[in-house]
């Protein structure tokens, strides 16, 4: 699949893993960020977990096993987007990006990830709770917030990786 398509893995997280992550989120600190390399006036939230063992070892090993290729971790972090806090179209500057969607999801909320692959194919992925997507880090992409002010924050866990 590498560099040619988007890999989608539904129900990537066990219920225990999901609970562990949500417990961590409840106590973490968020920082403001904008899409890589952009001078956007709209920011969204981020929290780096690259140095947290549960994320950089346990879950990262599960991501690697699912990919089936040897990769090294560049960065792991949470993205948080409230209604109206959109990212910009951007690339990640890594070989592979994985996103694990964590928030509740309803189809009418939107919140999809839009990706443009090398062959100009556009892929739209809905952020189903517990779903993981993997895609070439250099493909142009954007994460959209949920559509309504009454929706929860759209939270994903991002892994940026390089081939070994």
Regions flagged by a language model, labelled:
Residues 57, 61-164:
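Catalytic core of non-heme Fe(II) oxygenases with the double-stranded beta-helix
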Residues 1-70, 81:
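Non-heme Fe(II)/2-oxoglutarate
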């Amino acid at each position: 699949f590498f560099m040619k398509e988007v890999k989608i893995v539904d129900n990537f997280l066990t219920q225990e893993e999901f609970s562990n992550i949500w417990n961590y989120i409840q106590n973490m600190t968020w920082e403001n960020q904008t899409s890589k390399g952009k001078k956007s006036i709209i920011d969204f939230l981020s929290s780096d977990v690259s140095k947290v063992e549960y994320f950089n070892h346990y879950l990262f090993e599960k991501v690697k096993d699912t990919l089936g290729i040897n990769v090294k971790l560049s960065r792991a972090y949470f993205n948080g987007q409230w209604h109206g806090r959109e990212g910009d179209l951007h690339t990640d500057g890594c070989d592979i990006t994985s996103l694990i969607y964590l928030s509740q999801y309803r189809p009418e909320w939107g919140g999809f990830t839009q990706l443009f692959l090398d062959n100009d194919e556009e892929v739209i992925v809905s952020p189903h709770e517990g779903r993981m997507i993997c895609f070439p880090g250099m493909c142009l992409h954007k994460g959209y917030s949920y559509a309504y002010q009454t929706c929860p924050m759209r939270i994903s866990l991002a892994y940026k990786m390089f081939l070994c």
